[in-house]
Each structure stands twice: as structure tokens, then as C-alpha cells.
Curated annotation (Swiss-Prot):
This is Protein OCA4. One of its GO terms (molecular function) is phosphatase activity. It comes from Saccharomyces cerevisiae (strain ATCC 204508 / S288c) (Baker's yeast). The gene is OCA4. Pfam families: Y_phosphatase2. Disruption phenotype: Exhibits an absence of G1 checkpoint in response to linoleic acid hydroperoxide (LoaOOH) treatment. Rescues the temperature sensitivity of CDC13-1 mutant. Gene3D superfamilies: Protein tyrosine phosphatase superfamily. Required for replication of Brome mosaic virus (BMV). PANTHER family: PROTEIN OCA4, TYROSINE-PROTEIN PHOSPHATASE. One of its GO terms (cellular component) is cytoplasm.
Amino acid sequence: MLVPPANFGIAEEGIYRCSKVETLNLSFLETLNLKTAIFIGGQEPSKFFKDFFTRSSIKWIVLRMSDFSAAAVPVKSSSVSNANLYSNNNSTLSLQEEKKKSTANGSQNSTTGDPVIQEELAYHLTDNDDLMLIKSTCLKRTFKTLLNVDNYNVLLVDKTALVIGILRKIQKWNIASIINEYRLFSGKNRNYFAETFLEIINIEIEQEKDNKTIVDNKAKKLPLENNRTHSIEYKANSGKLIRVNEDDLCREPEVPQRLLTLINQIETKVKNNKVLQVSGVLGDDLKKTSSDLGIFGHRYRLAFNKKENGDYGYYKARGKDNVKIRIPCDSELPDWFRFQRDLWEKENVPEEHHFYREHIFT
């Protein structure tokens, strides 16, 4: 009988999630073709599961409770209500103080809706903060494994149900959808501080550079450098044997027949267009097109490729003191992540290119 683990679900293609695993779920886990298992929130695999992982050649990673804040532990409903009252009282007091300061400053701080002022008043998380439920070191290690397609399929055993919420934050989900998914999988163990943490945290991504493209570029440069060295050596060795004849220098250079035919075709097209313009058959908009100008009518892009540099607006976050995580290079990322990133870039980030155009034969 196949029994899935508690709060089991498919987060993305190749990523499975649950809150805990038991021996009853072993037959179900065998059908998932797992390569990696990540245990988050203090739970460690039992000896029975360790034997199963070694027998199935599954790598497992355990993140200790020292990487988490004490506020990540599930609290009772009474403590949640007390926390709500305490936070509401603090928020009302802080709002009253801000109103007093704004009225005292007068017209200088009249623009309270300024995004710069809102950014200064925003709360910024650090590892020393109690609201930082998962430390940055834990997040870096988790997402470096979670977003590497070489580790798929991955089972994420997350007792806190926060890692997938942070993944949704990276995917630019709405905060309401993130909280709803968190409440759906956490159930009665949901935490007020966890919801606040998901709302406050900002993630900034740094992507590793693809070593394959660097190696390919070096491999392309090496034969060119070798050819240059060989040509230099050949010139140095054969420089004494070259004999120059003055009659050869006085001759005109020979032009290949193919270039002559191309020039004749371009000249005939230009003459025909002039005749059509005089007769009024050809409009003003079609006087000079890119096909008439040949290769010199095209524009050439000078912008660098984003895939090589990993410079995406999708990876950037607003505000200061962002939690920086490092993800694998583009070739090791899953297809669903690259698809969502490229789609978001296409819809939200306008492309900026610097073009130049050749004006020869125009």
C-alpha cells in the first residue's frame, strides 16, 4: 500500500515537499526516483531511512536547528493572539510617533508616500534578528542544492514550510498567494512569525558563471594564438629568403570575380531604383531598404549577452540588507526556473541595446 508522507506535494517539476517522513512512507518514496533528500527544521533521518538512502544511492542533507531562530518553533493559538496584540500595540505606537514627527517637520516631510522614505522606514532583516527564522547560511546551502538539476528528483522535508515560501518569493509570487500556500501546507502548525518573515524577507540572487562557455572561449583562443606564434616563427625564419621584385609592386591587385559580379548587381539595382523613382513607380518609403544596401544596411548589436554575465532583473531585489543567495550556472538550472525567469524578463524588463550602422554605399 502506497502511503504518501504528511503534507506531501509537488512544489515544482523535480521538487517534492513534505513535513515529515515515517517508515510507513517507504514504499511510496521508492516510486519517486529520488537523488537527494533535504531535511530542514531539526528532523533527522532514522537509521532505517539512512540504510534505505545508502542502498538506493540517495544523498541526504541535514540542516540543524542551530541554523534556525527560536521563533520558528510552532506556537499555540493563545501565544499567537498575544503576539498579535503586542505587534498591533507596537505598530500603533510607532505610527503615532511617525505622525508626530511628520507634523512637527511640516512641509519638509509632506511627501510621506515617497518610495525613498518608505524604503528608509521599512524593516530590514539580518542574521542577528529574531525574526530571521532561517539564517542566510542555511538558505544559501538549501537553494544551491534545490535549484541544481543534477540533484533531481529532490525530496524537501521541511518542518517549517518556509523554504517553498521563499522560493515563491524568488518567483515573484504575490504575498497573498505565498501566505495561502503556507497555511495550506502548515495547517494547525502555522506560525504568525513565519508569515511575517515571508512578508519581510527580500532575496537577491547571484548566479555562478558558466565554466563551459569560459572553457570553450579559451579553447577557441588557443589555436589562434598557436597560429600566430607559428606565423611569427615562420616569418622570422623565412625573412631572409624573401625576394622582392619591383615589377610585382607596380601591378594592380587582382580582384576576385565574385566581388566584381556582386558590385555589378548592386550598381544595376541602384540604377533601376533611380529610374523607378523618376517615373514615380517607387514610393519614398522604399527608396533604400536593408536588402538594397546589402550587409551594410543592417544594424549590429553591441550589448553583452545576459546569459553569459548572469545579469537579470529577475535576480534583483528592492531595498537594503537583502539576503544574498548563490544559485548554479544557467546550464545547471531547471527548465521551469529558466522559463519563468525569461518570461518575467520579457514582460517587465525592457531590452536596452546600443546599435551602430554602416553607411557605406548609401
